[in-house]
Amino acid sequence: MSALTIPAARRTLNNAPIIDAANGKTPTRTPVWFMRQAGRSLPEYKKVREGISMLDSCFMPELLAEITLQPVRRHDVDAAILFSDIVVPLRAAGVGVEIVAGRGPVLDAPVRSRGDVLNLPILEGNVPEVEQGIGIILDELSDSQALIGFAGAPFTLASYLVEGGPSKNHEKTKAMMHGDPETWHALMARLVPTIVNSLKSQIDAGIDAVQLFDSWAGFLTERDYTEFVLPYSTEILEEVGKYQLPRIHFGVGTGELLGAMSKAGSEVMGVDWRVPLDKAAERIAAVSGPKVLQGNLDPALLFAGRAPLTKEIERIKAEAQTAVDAGHATGHIFNLGHGVLPNTVAEDITEAVSIIHS
């Protein structure tokens, strides 16, 4: 790849609040999108997904486009987030993986040895089904509505591979990390091109921003994150940075890791609900200088009713403004501190967006 690459498919956005905020500009309104906004909270999602597995739906262009667009139509959010799953790049590379209802991604064969790492397939090219879906999405979005692509960060993917599926304690992952560090580093290095090529495929198709999700990073100490994870997330974000589009970095339960994660290189840092935004901004700015903040409403507050919800939204917006005024942040994108909970009432999400925009 050249030093700077602007894909031919890249469209020109006009007064797009998400992109303006991510670039440190003043948006026309408080920008908002929600993680997992496309999903089980929407009755229309349940209808179109009926009888189709999660992973299969991620490789069906018309269906993934429809699901991506549903919350934009319903809620008036400022961005669509590509409907996908963090294990899609693994499946596209040829790894045996399924998403089991009520459990999550389950691997046919866990990765436990150096030989397993060497046999792990690498995604070499693009993912045409996803690219076709992105084309359909972009045809419907206005020039003020962004499309955010995403990928799972290497630590989270590595943990799924080593554990063989979801884990409460990540004991096999940490055992490899400390007991067989050579194999651990080999696994992380092998995942990097698969993640980069997945994001490159989305970028080539025309997405407007990317988010790197590190769902399980919050289980790590700062020392372990810095030694065993940071170099690989940094490499991925550096590669994406060559395409000159906003990069968002988010992990769950990572309040104590915000400074370390900010070193990986992104314009936007996602913050979960456990840390006030102004405090999060201080931690980030102390290490990497001021960045744009994203977050951080507790998803459970969408069940609380209009008055307490409004109070929380106003508090979060005030904390973000405090961070900006103090020089610790350069902007704010409103989001949840994690994903929309499956049993959230769709109308309550729409109401939250309206309150945020007001």
From Swiss-Prot:
Its EC number is 4.1.1.37. It comes from the Bacteria. Its main location: cytoplasm. It holds the Pfam family URO-D. The keyword Cytoplasm applies. Pathway: Porphyrin-containing compound metabolism; protoporphyrin-IX biosynthesis; coproporphyrinogen-III from 5-aminolevulinate: step 4/4. Keywords: Cytoplasm, Decarboxylase, Lyase, Porphyrin biosynthesis. It is an enzyme of class 4 (lyase). One of its GO terms (cellular component) is cytosol. GO terms for biological process: protoporphyrinogen IX biosynthetic process. It catalyses: uroporphyrinogen III + 4 H(+) = coproporphyrinogen III + 4 CO2. The keyword NAD does not apply. PROSITE patterns: UROD_1, UROD_2. Substrate binds at residues 36-40, 85, 160, 215, 338. It is found in: Cytoplasm. InterPro entries: UROD/MetE-like_sf, Uroporphyrinogen_deCO2ase_HemE, Uroporphyrinogen_deCOase. The record marks 85 as: Transition state stabilizer. One of its GO terms (molecular function) is uroporphyrinogen decarboxylase activity. SUPFAM superfamilies: UROD/MetE-like (SSF51726). NCBIfam families: hemE (TIGR01464). Belongs to the uroporphyrinogen decarboxylase family. Catalyzes the decarboxylation of four acetate groups of uroporphyrinogen-III to yield coproporphyrinogen-III. Homodimer. This is Uroporphyrinogen decarboxylase. The lineage of its organism: Bacteria, Bacillati, Actinomycetota, Actinomycetes, Mycobacteriales. The gene is hemE.
